Amino acid sequence: MLFMGACAGQKAVVEAPKPPPPPSATVVSLSLGDVFFDFDKSELRGDARDQLQTNYRWLAENPSRKLTIEGHCDERGTNEYNLALGERRANTAKDYIVNLGAAAGRINTVSYGEERPFASGHSEDAWAQNRRDHFVAQ
């Protein structure tokens, strides 16, 4: 777009700024995702390993950020047992990410046991959603 103006008999031509180029189609946005566990287990499933690799890449691409891994359980079992199981789950995920190359000091763990369910209800579907590690960026 051109703008023309007159000043003391002189004509000036001023070009409007060009719009920025469109973003590259190769930009990939990685985000943190939860990992899920089988009943009464802290071993990683295949889908959990895949998500942990994505979470590791996010951490590698954000060197100024830290993570907290929250270990969670379903409502079955005692509070003490579930706190210990949640801790094992969080530590298993941390160990996996550290083995991929992350600095251990950038990752904290905490267990909430059954205290902070994601899904309400008393069904296998609800319990499966609550047996998880949740990742919080800091």
Q: How would you describe each model-predicted region?
A:
Residues 47, 51-54, 80, 84, ...:
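Extracytoplasmic/secreted proteins, especially bacterial periplasmic and envelope-associated proteins
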Residues 7-66:
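Periplasmic peptidoglycan-binding/tethering modules of Gram-negative envelope proteins
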Residues 125-129:
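A generic structural micro-feature
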Residues 73-78:
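Surface-exposed aromatic
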Residues 120-123:
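Short beta-alpha junctions and helix-cap segments that line functional grooves
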Residues 34-37, 82-84, 134:
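Short aromatic/hydrophobic contact patches that present stacked aromatics
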Residues 63-72, 87-118, 131-138:
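A non-catalytic structural micro-motif
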Residues 1-5:
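Sec-dependent bacterial lipoprotein signal peptides
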